[in-house]
């Protein structure tokens, strides 16, 4: 059997053509990613014998021609595959480069307001989708459908990939955990991570004495600032959204923020209303000569010459038609005489029914008043004898007077309760976004400025949206200061309440409601300062909430300080300079007398300034300490501010659920009174 001869060993020597080709394989400066296509592969190499004569080499090549052709075929196929791979990657990269350049151009361009509004809609749609998916996930978990729950979790994760704020916050907390403080500071200052927390706001260019308390939280694609009133803070109720800060990332890796102010539309769908065009005074006013069949509900118009806002009666009367139908639905067959239509604000049906039930229960339990039915005959008889329209009080009035104005306190409580319910607890359905700017953003403060021109332009095209204007309430505010005092005097002297007094109380309630509703608004430039919510066991350090006056509750921030009082009567001689430790109560929410941001009271603390425990407040209340201090009083509008002597009282709070209680006694020359504050703890 013949044996196959082994082919001689051959060396591969590269020709000049091959070296030129290899030089083409080196990356050039113009095209750094892909080499040029190779020429004919036959020019790559040639076969030569390492040793032996020419005859032997020629004979061996003649004997084994198939080895040369096989090597060439292998090289050809390898080069073809290599070229095809290079061409495919080059085509793919060119397509991606074109798409990427287009995306970068879109993101790098400065967005106008219309482009931002499209982004707002996209974020809202994604947020609604996330809410639906999360609710479906909860239902799937409850019914133990884990396969469906797994799919929903994947869908939630896919939707959350567009959440720029969520990525920023997760990266921020991871950087803090890994002690990468440089990255954390960058995200805090540039990406808005430092805005999360509690802030107190005070208007810089508008005289707003009330102030704001807002909490900024990180949500899908935006930071949301919600405003809270004192009642919402004490009951942990939900706040009303006030402004938003949207976040995007451009093609260069820079963060862009756009702040928007939420102007809520005054739309209350639960209250029956009618278009103003179809309302005429003849439809709901009873003429002197005849009566209309209104279901035992008669509305009279009475003029008050002393009223400052009589010009607005026509607007107020338009709202009485819906009020009539509402009362017919709530109390069938009711007999009511409305002596004057005031503007108590648009109120929720369910809330009014609760108030009516509460009043009915109180009347059944206490039997304080017996209100007689007043029959409506004509306006002439009412004008001749106005005293017949007085509401007589029974013998229980003496008990009210003996209780030192207990009924007055109850009235204040009801008014304050209504104010707090209407000022933010009722969720508003629709809002209008208007542009705003963040300025001087720091770790402890920032400014929010509204763009007035765009605000006016946007508000003109939206029905039911009104800008805040306090001119209408300023005139009525002058008459309110002594209304409750006149009411108490009327009860004490005449044992009756006149109709005029009831009108004044109605105006007071109307103004208080309007003030509470407008208190959530912003205008111009507002400065926000960070609120430190770190828990503290020191009773003289932290947040406190208390009741004050007729308007609303107050939130103060107690702070320990060392030095001298500002604006005090201390001697300015260098030899008499004395430093001491003292505590200040700064108002986070104010009132028309002492606005927000001002010091409500202060007291020097320490054994040197401590007073005996026996004082105005009995020791049974758990008095821990008493310190001599000063309280601030002022006239409406913060006119004639003055310091009066007082004392700071600290109670142990054994009988109070909220912990320690702080009180301050005002020793004013004309009267003395005390204010109590309970500890307020906000979630960080």
Curated annotation (Swiss-Prot):
Q: Which domain of life is it from?
A: Eukaryota
Q: Is Plastid there in the keyword field?
A: yes
**Region feature (Disordered):** 1-66, 278-318
Q: Which GO terms describe its biological process?
A: singlet oxygen-mediated programmed cell death
List where Polar residues composition bias occurs: 1-31
Biased composition, class Acidic residues, residue ranges: 301-318
Subcellular location, principal: plastid
Record-level GO cellular component terms: chloroplast; thylakoid membrane
User: What job does the chain carry out?
Assistant: Together with EX2, enables higher plants to perceive singlet oxygen as a stress signal in plastid that activates a genetically determined nuclear stress response program which triggers a programmed cell death (PCD). This transfer of singlet oxygen-induced stress-related signals from the plastid to the nucleus that triggers genetically controlled PCD pathway is unique to photosynthetic eukaryotes and operates under mild stress conditions, impeding photosystem II (PSII) without causing photooxidative damage of the plant.
| Induction profile | Down-regulated by H(2)O(2).
Q: Which gene encodes it?
A: EX1
Q: What is this protein called?
A: Protein EXECUTER 1, chloroplastic
Keyword set, alphabetical order: Chloroplast, Plastid, Stress response, Transit peptide
Indicate, by first and last residue, each region the UniProt record lists as having compositional bias (Low complexity): 48-61
Annotated localization: Plastid, Chloroplast
Domain UVR span(s) in chain numbering: 127-162
Q: Does the keyword Transit peptide apply?
A: yes
Q: Where are the transmembrane segments?
A: none
Q: Name its species.
A: Arabidopsis thaliana (Mouse-ear cress)
Interval spanned by the transit peptide: 1-46
């Amino acid at each position: 059997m013949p044996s196959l001869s082994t082919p001689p060993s051959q060396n591969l020597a590269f020709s000049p053509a091959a070296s030129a080709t290899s030089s083409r394989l080196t990356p050039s400066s113009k095209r750094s990613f892909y080499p040029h296509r190779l020429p004919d592969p036959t020019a790559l190499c040639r076969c030569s014998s390492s040793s032996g004569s020419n005859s032997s080499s020629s004979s061996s090549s003649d004997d084994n021609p198939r080895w040369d052709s096989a090597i060439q075929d292998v090289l050809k196929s390898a080069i073809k595959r290599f070229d095809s791979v290079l061409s495919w990657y080059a085509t793919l990269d060119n397509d991606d480069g074109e798409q990427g350049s287009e995306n970068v151009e879109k993101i790098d361009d400065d967005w106008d307001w219309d482009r931002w509004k499209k982004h707002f809609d996209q974020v809202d749609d994604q947020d609604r989708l996330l809410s639906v998916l999360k609710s479906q996930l909860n239902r799937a978990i409850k019914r133990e459908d884990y396969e469906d729950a797994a799919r929903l979790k994947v869908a939630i994760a896919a939707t959350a990939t567009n959440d720029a704020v969520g990525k920023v916050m997760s990266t921020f907390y991871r950087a803090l955990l890994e002690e990468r403080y440089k990255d954390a500071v960058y995200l805090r200052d540039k990406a808005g991570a430092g805005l999360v927390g509690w802030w107190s706001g005070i208007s810089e260019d508008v005289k707003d004495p009330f102030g704001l308390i807002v909490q900024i939280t990180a949500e899908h694609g935006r930071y949301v600032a919600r405003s809270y009133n004192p009642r919402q803070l004490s009951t942990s109720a939900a706040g009303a959204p006030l402004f938003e800060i949207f976040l995007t990332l451009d093609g260069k890796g820079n963060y862009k923020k756009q702040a928007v102010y939420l102007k809520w539309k005054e739309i209350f769908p639960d209250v029956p209303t009618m278009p103003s065009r179809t309302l005429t005074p003849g439809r709901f006013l009873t003429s002197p000569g005849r009566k209309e069949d209104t279901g035992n509900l008669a509305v009279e118009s009475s003029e008050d010459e002393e009223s400052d806002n009589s010009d607005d009666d026509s607007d107020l009367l338009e709202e009485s038609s819906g009020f009539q139908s509402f009362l017919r639905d709530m109390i069938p067959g009711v007999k009511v005489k409305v002596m004057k239509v005031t503007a108590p604000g648009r109120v929720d049906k369910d809330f009014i029914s609760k108030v009516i039930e509460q009043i009915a229960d109180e009347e059944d339990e206490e039997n304080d008043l017996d209100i007689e039915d007043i029959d409506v005959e004509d306006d002439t008889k009412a004008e001749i004898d106005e005293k017949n329209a007085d509401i007589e009080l029974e013998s229980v009035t003496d008990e009210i007077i003996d209780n030192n104005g207990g009924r007055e306190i109850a009235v204040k409580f009801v008014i304050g309760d209504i104010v707090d319910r209407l000022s933010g607890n009722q969720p508003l359905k629709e809002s209008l976004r208007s542009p705003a700017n963040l300025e001087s953003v720091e770790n402890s403060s920032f400014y929010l400025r509204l763009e007035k021109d765009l605000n006016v332009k946007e508000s003109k095209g939206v029905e039911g949206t009104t800008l805040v204007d306090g001119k209408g309430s300023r005139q009525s505010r002058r008459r309110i200061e002594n209304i409750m005092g006149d009411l108490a005097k009327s009860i004490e002297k005449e044992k009756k309440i006149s109709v005029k007094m009831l009108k004044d109380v109605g105006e007071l309630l109307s103004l208080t409601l309007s003030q509470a509703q407008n208190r959530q608004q912003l205008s111009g430039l507002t400065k926000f300062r960070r609120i430190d919510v770190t828990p503290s066991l020191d009773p003289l350090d932290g947040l406190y909430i208390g009741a004050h006056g007729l308007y609303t509750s107050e939130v103060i921030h107690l702070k320990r300080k060392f030095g001298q009082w500002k604006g005090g009567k201390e001697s300015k001689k260098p030899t008499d300079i004395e430093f001491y430790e003292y505590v200040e109560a700064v108002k986070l929410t104010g009132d028309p007398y002492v606005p927000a941001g001002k010091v409500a009271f202060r007291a020097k603390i320490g054994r040197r300034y401590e007073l005996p425990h026996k004082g105005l407040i009995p020791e049974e209340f758990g008095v821990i300490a008493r310190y001599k201090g000063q309280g601030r009083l002022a006239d409406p509008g913060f006119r004639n501010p003055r310091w009066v002597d007082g004392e700071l009282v600290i109670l142990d709070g054994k009988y109070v659920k909220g912990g320690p209680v702080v009180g301050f006694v005002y020793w004013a020359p004309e009267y003395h009174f005390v204010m109590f504050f309970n500890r307020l703890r906000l979630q960080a």
